[in-house]
From Swiss-Prot:
InterPro entries, sorted: RNA_methyltr_RlmE, RNA_MeTrfase_FtsJ_dom, rRNA-MeTfrase_E, rRNA_MeTfrase_SPB1-like_C, rRNA_MeTfrase_Spb1_DUF3381, SAM-dependent_MTases_sf, SPB1-like
Function description: Required for proper assembly of pre-ribosomal particles during the biogenesis of the 60S ribosomal subunit.
Protein name, UniProt field: AdoMet-dependent rRNA methyltransferase SPB1
Family: Belongs to the class I-like SAM-binding methyltransferase superfamily. RNA methyltransferase RlmE family. SPB1 subfamily.
Active site: K158 (proton acceptor)
Subcellular location: Nucleus, Nucleolus
Amino acid sequence: MGKHDKKTGKGRLDKFYRLAKEQGYRARSAFKLVHLNRKYDLLSKARCCIDLCAAPGGWLQVAEKYMPKGSLIIGVDLNAIKPLPHVTTFVADITTPHCRQTLRQHMHDWKADLVLHDGAPNVGSAWVQDAFTQNELVLQSLKLATEFLAKGGSFVTKVFRSQDYNSLLWVFGQLFKSVEATKPPSSRNVSAEIFVVCRDFIAPKHIDPKFLDPKHVFKDIASLPTSITEPTDTSIAPTSSSTASAAAAAARLAANSHAHSNVYAPEKKRRHREGYAEGDYTLHHTASAEEFVRGQDPVLLLGNMNKIEFRNETEKGWLKSRHTTPDIIANFEDLKVLGKGDFKALMKWRLAIRLEIGLDVKADKTQDATEEVVVEPMDEEEQITEELQKLQQAKLAKTKRERKRANEKKARELLKLQLNMTVPDDLDQNDLALQGEEEIFDLEEGENEARRRGKNGGLATLVDDGEGMDLASESEEEEDEDEEDDEVLDSDEERERKTAALEGELDGLYDSYVERKKERDAKWKVKQDRLKDKNFDAWHGIQEKSDEEGSDDDDGQDDDEEGGWDVIAQKKAKYGEGDSSDSDSDAEPETEVPKKIKKVSFEKPARSEKSSGLMTSLREPELRAQRSKQAQLWFDQPVFKEVGDLAALDGDDEEEEEEDESEEEESDDEDVDMEDASESSSTLEGDDDFEIVPQAPEDDGPEWDVDDEDQDEVKKKVIQDKGLLTAEAVSLATALVNRKTTADKLIDQGFNRLSAHNKDGLPTWFLDDESQFYKPNIPITKEAVDALRARQRALDARPIKKVAEAKGRKKMKAVARMEKAKKKADGVMESEEMGDGEKARQVRRMLARAAKGKEKAKEKKIVVAKGVNKGVKGRPTGVKGKYKIVDARMRKEVRALKRIKKAGSKRR
């Protein structure tokens, strides 16, 4: 097919498509009805119109436009039609009784003057099948039209040119006085559609249902033999008219309607209401045996005839055949009483007789099974070319499969993202534990595996102390002791250990969830940090806390005080990383002495193979406390009294860095003493194998928090500057002012079940959830909310700084212009050359010019020389003021220059 015949998208956007867009029609097919109405005048006198298969509604728009006002217009389609003024639409299938009932409900006692049908089925690659389906749909629409059309009405339908076209025309000709086929100009030439306009409906009182049945109207009769389909004693002269041949075909179809069913299902009784065939007034029909043997359709003959006779000598000779049994002869005598098995026996007898007389030849199975295959020799180039083609096809098929697989995987991933079905990245999707086949996590197995690997290769790096002692033997002894301790653990301890492992797993999952929330929403982290520590944010702002800060922070602040959430997170990080910093570790602590020492910091010792494991001994806290007491007793000796308080030495580096320079100068002497003390203590530790463990402060006395020092003053200052910011605060303040409550009552109400909440030992994810929902609900009043909203509206009504500055500059320029105009007016009034009237006019003009300001110069209007303005001379139509005619390229350049000029201009 040529390039101009391809039905591409852009090729179908013809002038009627553009006209439909301009005139507001929903489809370009609306112009088909416009052209048909212009030729046949179908709509001007119609008072009731039915449009079958009306979506999207283009023909309904044309009918509403050209029909008289107040007419009844009804549209039916399988798809919903958007509402149109003065048009009734509903969704139904025109082949169902439901559509017929709905039409009756809408029309009441009306009869339609016009029935339109522009529908088509969903077409595919089989043209013959699609054409038959279209013609079947046309016949169904005609069936509806015969029920609702008034006498003298019109019917317009779309038909595809096919072999059933003449049958349709014959049916139309029986029901309408005038039938014309036409093709409007708006119909594409590449389309096989034509429109049949049927006028002057006859409106018969009774129509045979078979007359509108597609099985009978479109039945193929070309293959039927003449001896069966036509009587032998009558001959119908062929006519040139297609309608006459179609009428004869329909008559023959009506006569032989049940012939095949009489043979294949003879036991089923039927009531024949079709009457006698034309020219056939007898009920008993006979045929010769030769017609049965030599005929093309023996089944049709058996169904129509009553008896088969052996008339001539040839037929009587078949009676002597071994295949002609008495049962066969008896069956031929009366065909109407035979069953299905008897008809099969007659068909087998026919095949046998045809083989005897030579009409049929028995096929040789051996010859059919063996086929001679002729292989033509191929030269080398053809073989190479064929192999290359096969390889290329295989490669293309493989690439196509891979691309399809990748697209399917991408679609699945996209669907998972849309449904929030993602899983943490650190989880293995092929892990059997996730499928429930084994336990989720077992710390004991991991620890045992670590010990098996670490006995030989885990302690590859051995640390020597100052005396040259090898610590590997001591670490091995400690590992043996730990193994013995693990063996004696009972089931309760194992259960507790697994429970702790599960809690740690949940904490890890919660941490990954928090990280994903931070990545998705930037504001989420700010909100969470504000909820955790409001006082810290008020003074220092929200900032990320590193692992070092979290591990070094050991202020011992209670969780119930302000900032308790951060303390929990820091303790969690410290216990996760620094549980091994006890005296069991055999590595010597490395003390780094900076240039400017402010205090002595005892760093954590290096982690051993045991301390880096997954499990933590349950006896470790007791051992740590016991060794801490031993170390305290050791350092109570008189030798260490000059060193000072060891607990005070373990401070925070960050707090010391924030001290003033004056304090640094005063502490220089003390730093030197601290350094000496550190050296002496480390020496003693190396000699006696003791580790200095800082003692935690006692929890007996009350702690002093610097953050609580001026909190009341800070809150007062915020209220003075910004006022009450929440509806709860406004409600409480209003109640206090109106003496509905007192300060003592408010203080008493602050002590409730939600205020005393013990947070020790609770996981972070639980505490985060409790911080949102486990808090007192203070009732608020409508007046408080209205007051806050009124204040917010007042703030929103104020202009932004940029707008206010622009207005101020504009006002200053206007004042300057007015002052300048006043000075000029004074000069004019002092002039003696002009009269009083002239002076007044000059002053009035200057003041008006100053008040008005400078007028912006009108820009030239750019007119593109295309369409109606192409090649025009003089001023284009509809253009006022200054103009400039340019082409499309120059218009883009002008816009680019404006854009560059605007971007380059500096804002004052």
